[in-house]
């Protein structure tokens, strides 16, 4: 049973884990995640912790999960929409083979450049093509081009929740049959089951309906198999089957 302190902590919107016990989450981190976390990822995690918007970063346990997943599917050509300081990007770059590629897009290059020295020091910058600006125009151009259809093994989306469905409409053509798309924050701080009068922060309440709409659409999409996991803030994996 959670203590009162743990209950209080989990009422805070910024808490990254959906587990009902802080002690249990810390056990996972300290037993299985931090001891195996590569030094570059630890360095970037500690740098990002000083950022005023550090809640935007991918959690360490989710980074570990993504790394394992990428290796299991032998991913080589990947895309990331929403980079922030690059923790999940670094996890991806470390998991890919030396000739692996990541197209990374974010509207804020300044945040990306916080983590870039760590990525460069790890000898992984050659795997990354970073584009600053909205992702939708880039995706539209790729679809129009034609040669990118079905070319991606894995795509990770951790960006503007109000555009998740717009991303999905395009990404389904760019990921290969058998490839995966991962949508982050699909449990959105647990707000997806919150009652209408729940005390939610404004940004959580604003994006909640978009996340609910996405979850409903993914569940009904016959082109994919899905698996929604309570890792981090919730991640939904979509495997393209047609």
From Swiss-Prot:
Pathway: Aromatic compound metabolism; phenylpropanoid biosynthesis. Its cofactor is Mg(2+). It catalyses: (E)-caffeoyl-CoA + S-adenosyl-L-methionine = (E)-feruloyl-CoA + S-adenosyl-L-homocysteine + H(+). It holds the Pfam family Methyltransf_3. A divalent metal cation binds at residues 158, 184-185. Keywords: Lignin biosynthesis, Magnesium, Metal-binding, Methyltransferase, S-adenosyl-L-methionine, Transferase. Binds 1 Mg(2+) ion per subunit. GO terms for molecular function: caffeoyl-CoA O-methyltransferase activity; metal ion binding; S-adenosylmethionine-dependent methyltransferase activity. S-adenosyl-L-methionine binds at residues 58, 80, 82-83, 88, 106, 135, 160. The keyword Iron-sulfur does not apply. InterPro entries: Cation-dep_OMT (IPR050362), SAM-dependent_MTases_sf (IPR029063), SAM_O-MeTrfase (IPR002935). Its EC number is 2.1.1.104. Belongs to the class I-like SAM-binding methyltransferase superfamily. Cation-dependent O-methyltransferase family. CCoAMT subfamily. Methylates caffeoyl-CoA to feruloyl-CoA and 5-hydroxyferuloyl-CoA to sinapoyl-CoA. Plays a role in the synthesis of feruloylated polysaccharides. Involved in the reinforcement of the plant cell wall. Also involved in the responding to wounding or pathogen challenge by the increased formation of cell wall-bound ferulic acid polymers. Also methylates free caffeic and 5-hydroxyferulic acids. This is Caffeoyl-CoA O-methyltransferase 3. It comes from Nicotiana tabacum.
């Amino acid at each position: 049973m959670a203590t009162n302190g743990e209950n209080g902590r989990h009422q805070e919107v910024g808490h990254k884990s959906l587990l009902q016990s802080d002690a249990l989450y810390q056990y996972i981190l300290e037993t299985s995640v931090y001891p195996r976390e590569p030094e570059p990822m630890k360095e970037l995690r500690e740098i990002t912790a000083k950022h005023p918007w550090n809640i935007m970063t991918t959690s360490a346990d989710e980074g570990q999960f993504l790394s394992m997943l990428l290796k299991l599917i032998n991913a080589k050509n990947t895309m990331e929409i929403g980079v922030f300081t690059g923790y999940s990007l670094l996890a991806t770059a470390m998991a890919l083979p030396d000739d692996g590629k990541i197209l990374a897009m974010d509207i804020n290059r300044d945040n990306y450049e916080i983590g870039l020295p760590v990525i460069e020091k790890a000898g992984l910058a050659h795997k990354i093509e970073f584009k600053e600006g909205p992702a939708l125009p880039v995706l539209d151009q790729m679809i129009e081009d034609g040669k990118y259809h079905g070319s991606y093994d894995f795509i990770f989306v951790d960006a503007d929740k109000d555009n998740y469905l717009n991303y999905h409409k395009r990404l389904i053509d760019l990921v290969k049959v058998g490839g995966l798309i991962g949508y982050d924050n699909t449990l959105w701080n647990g707000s997806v089951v919150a009652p209408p009068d729940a005390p939610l922060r404004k940004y959580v309440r604003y994006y909640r309906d978009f996340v609910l709409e996405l979850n409903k659409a993914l569940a009904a999409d016959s082109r994919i198999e899905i698996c929604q996991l309570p890792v981090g803030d919730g991640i939904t994996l979509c495997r393209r089957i047609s």
